[in-house]
């Protein structure tokens, strides 16, 4: 940092780890020409006065990081803004990051700072964005009245964000105003105990405005909060016990038709403490969406203008307790929500849309004066006080229910008109007084309350007050009807019409009409309603008579005043009729109810049925008798002998000890509840729960059909269910002492089963699809059952007997239950499964399906284990499992893997996989092992004898054939002087065969699997040596030489690098011939040569160990020609030429020890220059000098048996210098006058070979490095030839020169390869003898041919044979 007299500045990054004295009381600027970053770290404490001002990023992005307990304290002595982070640039950003316990940034003013600019800017200037991030106990405190701008403070956009996360993380600005995104988006997030306090807080401006407060002790404290936003969904979201504390008002305003939200959500909603919530312009919204049933909201709600504000209650029960008198916005209650109030001021003048519950609880009179629509519930409880509607028009569109409890209500005038579209429910403790005349409402229901209809006129057919319903009349509940002149009721004829059926006698003499429902639907028959006087006393004049059927007294009937829906079921009447039946007879003598062709009320019994006798039903097939009195309490048998029975209310079957359903009969519970002792349904009968709730307390048999939805509770005894019930969809509860026995998996249909008792399946096969829960027992007896439901909440016990099979396909099927298995447990999973269930027993466990099954110590079964498909995984590395199974059968598609082992025997027809993340896994078989052409898979670090490896330990005997596949994990290959033990057999292994499966290769070596010698004959070892040695001595001696199994690929790599360096090596006499050309410089006719040669060769050699035998075939084509000649006078001449070539070499290597083979190939191109000097260019006698240089590039490939193919490239330079001297040692004539000239030419050549191969990593990780480049190849030899001149060829320019050449070749380096550093080289090439013979000839002035055959012989069986043909054509 550059500190001058008055200020300090720097560009880029400044990190301060100790308090810097040189900055004392000076302005500091970081980033004047680039982004600036100031890091204060390592508990550095920057005290007041060190920085007079701090500006980070001047026209660039800026950031301040105060971390790891560091502190930055500032005051305002300079008179300018004390802290600016990121300023004066379009779209720049400023960040203040405070993280770590005791990390703090603080600012306080000084007495001398009066009138100074005390604002703090994080993101300064038009369009600037600002972030304040406080984590892990960091603190930002402003200790005086200072404006804080997060994001731009001037128009032009610019977002602001404050994130405070973690306990003790806080920002304190109690005397300051904070602006977050004043002209853009504003975001504040307080999490996990983060806290923010400010005097006034302004969030958002031209964009989004969001505040999130979540987590215990997360708290936002302010004197006033203003949320503004013109886009998105601006608002405050409070969850998980977060706290919003505002001393003044929370102001929610929006623009551009957006919604501003104050959101209370989560299971544990947060708290708001404020002077009030101001709903301003726009769609300002308060949302309650939580799961609490007792959440209190006390902040007052205020509409700035009439109609401002929306309160959405989306879920949970919210108590509005504040003074909301000035709220005139919308209160919207959704079906899953409830709003509770105790004072009119709690809902103010709100307009209510009620599709949920509005609960009024008060101890005073209540006049409802709000406008309300919707179809929900208005529940009113006034503690015995009056409730009324102030204005009849406010609720005329409310189509829901007015539910009154402990409340007085006058059904007349405005109260009646207000309920034009609603239903009135008379709840417990409520008294409704019907006004004089007819009161028309939508619907009426009794639920324990009373209705006072006033006086009854003697002889009249109605009371002075009557109710008319237009939609529904519910008289199937409890309640009371009151009249004020009970003596006039006595005028009703007390006549018993014996000519009517018993089912019609409960509706007879319906004389005085109280409720007219002639255009409505009537549900129930009024049998549970009492007739009372005005004081609530029962009006009664009862008579009793015997009920005789078939000459026997079967019951006693009681006749009295009662309420009824009348014979036509068209309202509510006072009549004199049957009110009670006391059952006396049982069995065949039981009271019989018979529809006898009637329907409706004529086939309904609304009188109370009591007594200890039985009740029988015997209608014709298809005819129905209904019961509608929920006070029935008879205890005898309910025998449905014929026809159907319909329940029209709860408990209409009383306390019956048994329901008997005969063939072709039907009981329809019609959505109602009933408790009975036994259920006995005959085959062909139907029990339709139909949305109801049936409880069985004793034994029973269901041989008929069970159907419908609802609930079935078996609280005791044994219920036998015969056959399937596919349309039965109830939720079944089996209590602790109860049992359900089924012979069909769909006996309980498809619904959920909560089982705390016993669910027994006998001879039941198929899919049990029900979702199970509870802690009871599911027992299989001679059954083959697959459980397919989601039983995650089932913690009970599955019991499988010896003749049964239980099948599960996933963890959710078994839940967390235990399994006691004496039969077959089949786990048929196609996805991976961690078995957490305790499984015991002597039965078989069968693993099928392609997924894996991992077992822990909970796998305690001792029976046989069959792994038919997929994998069975034992334990984990730190928690191995010894499977207690007596026998494990691994099928062809199965695999056993993991850690630990098997207590019993193992038969392997599939895979026994010991591999894991690191080698060293030892799997133990406590019994015998039988290989049935299965595979053993292990990981080994293929190095020396001490290498880490997986191992199979067999405590018993071993037999059969097993393939062993070894994977190298990081081994580089080495000489295993004493081998690596991978299989150990304590018992007899004479009949066992563990056979190596595929190549086991690492580095330069092939490892082989074989038995140990001598006493270790029962063990199997991996070795890279020729023979399996005795066990390792201690200490292990150092290996010497190559007494190990080399990989054939080593010689393939070697053959490639050797061929690439040698295939384009040429000699002068392989480029013979001359043509004429015009010198490009002098224009004189000159002699030139244009040549091409073809060579094919065959090569044989061995590596240095003698293990690898290689032979290869090559082909080379080269062509070239002179491009310039010059001389220095006389007959000497220089020739300069160019040449190019293509060649390929294909090799094959066999390893004599292992029998493995590999193939290699290399093909490439070369281009180069040559230069030749002849002392006598005309005769080529005397001395010559020849040199050339070529650059070659090659593609290489190697493929070994059982290994992936490898490819790489090589390239480099080769160069040669050759010299010799030719002279004619004589001439002689032969027959026919032919002249023969004899020449001898000693030769010497020096070739430098510099082709290098790229470094290669094989697929198995072996590093391949070719060697031998830089070899200097020398040749010393002599060539002799005879030039024959035949008289027949005079003037034809035809001549022939047969020759013989002998050479000694020497190489300074051997071509080879290093495989993971282990060298393998081509042997026998240091000194090579060569014999070559051929002929050179000119056919005519235009065509020259030459060819030769060459044989090279070296040491160690090296030999090379080649043939070459050259051709020249003169144009």
From Swiss-Prot:
UniProt biased composition (Basic and acidic residues): 1029-1046
UniProt keywords, alphabetically: Cell outer membrane, Membrane, Plasmid, Transmembrane, Transmembrane beta strand
Pfam families for this protein: AC_1, Autotransporter
PROSITE patterns with a match to the protein in the record: AUTOTRANSPORTER
Localization per Swiss-Prot or TrEMBL: Cell outer membrane
Regions annotated as coiled coil: none
Domain of life according to the entry: Bacteria
CDD domains: PL2_Passenger_AT (cd01344)
UniProt membrane topology term: Peripheral membrane protein
Record-level GO cellular component terms: cell outer membrane
SUPFAM superfamilies: Autotransporter (SSF103515), Pectin lyase-like (SSF51126)
Residue ranges annotated for the Autotransporter domain, each copy included: 1083-1371
Designated name of the protein: Uncharacterized protein YuaQ
